[in-house]
């Protein structure tokens, strides 16, 4: 029986998410020849790190790929995806796990994601997008007319998980909205969704969807969630309290309709569709979409995948 060829994989990124991806890949047999750009000290124990190649230097990423000739490139962070890293690498002839820049707008613009969800009949929070400071007051009244629940104010574009304010203080909501608009951005104002939040990663080849294990992360800093939103303070999985059919529900009502809508528009989504969900008293609702593995959830989800599935 012949020996299996050793696969070479390049992972773009430098965080705990990328470390988790490489750690899981390193457990395969035979172990792949792993490379990271730029990587970090923990990753360096498992892979060759190319520290000079940053996550947003697309030219350097292509040059590195042409030098080491990976069989697969995995792009971790959202920013290079939105900037077109996957497109550049595919154009150079490499196999990439990660969506095109056009598909990554699903994360890059919350307003556009809402449009996709509406077209695909995906359940989500009612919302309004404002582009002028003068529109903020009326917008808040529209999504939260009584002011009896928290206000939800989100920067439309990428903000590393820190562009969202959920507060009962109307003035704080207005202050955040003004700051985003005055910086040249748009603001998405949403109705508040009650119930626990869940993250579910769905792997897609542009037409099919396969869910991974659900997880829950903790976004706010400080004890008792007293601080502002962060990129993620921690996470755990599995979720013993979650409905047994949660993953099936999400694929049927959220992920597959979204992937189908993207394909119908000529924008196939290949990679991880991160479904951020709220299990509300009125049923499952989408809080957000991301176009990549979440961090820190990746660190607890990938540990549950059997070797045969890596």
Annotate each language-model stretch with its function:
Residues 2-101:
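ATP-binding N-terminal substructure of ATP-dependent carboxylate-amine bond-forming enzymes
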Residues 11, 36-37, 74-75, 96-99, ...:
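General beta-strand structural signal in soluble alpha/beta enzymes
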Residues 49-57, 128-132, 167:
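Short acidic-hydrophobic, aromatic-tinged amphipathic segments that line or gate anion-handling sites
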Residues 64, 139-143, 176:
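CheY-like receiver
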Residues 66-70, 143-148, 183:
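Glycine-rich phosphate-binding loop signature in dinucleotide/nucleotide-binding domains
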Residues 73, 308-310:
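Conserved small/polar residues in nucleotide/adenosyl-binding loops
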Residues 99-163:
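A conserved helix-loop-beta module that forms one wall/lid of the active-site cleft
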Residues 163-300:
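Internal nucleotide-binding/catalytic subdomain
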């Amino acid at each position: 029986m012949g020996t299996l060829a050793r696969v070479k994989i390049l992972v773009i990124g430098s965080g705990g998410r990328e470390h988790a991806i490489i750690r899981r890949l390193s457990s395969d047999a035979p172990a792949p020849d792993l490379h990271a750009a730029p990587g970090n000290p923990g990753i360096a124990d498992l892979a060759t790190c190319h520290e000079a190649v940053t996550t947003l230097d697309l030219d350097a990423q292509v040059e590195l790929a042409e030098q080491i000739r990976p069989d697969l490139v995995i792009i971790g962070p959202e920013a290079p995806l939105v900037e077109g890293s996957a497109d550049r690498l595919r154009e150079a002839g490499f196999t990439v796990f990660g969506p095109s820049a056009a598909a990554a707008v699903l994360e890059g613009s919350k307003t556009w994601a809402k449009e996709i969800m509406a077209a695909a009949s995906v359940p989500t929070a009612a919302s309004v997008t404002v582009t002028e400071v003068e529109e903020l007051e009326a917008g808040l009244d529209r999504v939260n007319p009584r002011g009896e629940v928290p206000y939800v104010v989100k920067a439309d574009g990428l903000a590393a998980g820190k562009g969202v304010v959920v507060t009962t203080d109307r003035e704080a909501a207005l202050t955040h909205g003004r700051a985003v608009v005055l910086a040249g951005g748009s603001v998405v104002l949403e109705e508040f969704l009650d119930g626990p939040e869940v993250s579910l990663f769905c792997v897609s080849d542009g037409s099919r969807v396969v869910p991974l294990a659900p997880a829950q992360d903790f976004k706010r800093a400080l004890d008792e969630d007293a601080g502002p939103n962060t990129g993620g303070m921690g996470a755990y999985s599995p979720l013993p309290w979650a409905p047994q059919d949660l993953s099936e529900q999400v694929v049927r009502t959220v992920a597959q309709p979204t992937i189908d809508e993207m394909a119908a528009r000529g924008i196939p989504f290949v990679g991880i569709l991160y479904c951020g969900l709220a299990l509300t008293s009125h049923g499952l609702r989408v809080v957000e979409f991301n176009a990549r593995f979440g961090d820190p959830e990746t660190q607890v989800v990938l540990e549950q995948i059997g070797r045969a599935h890596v």
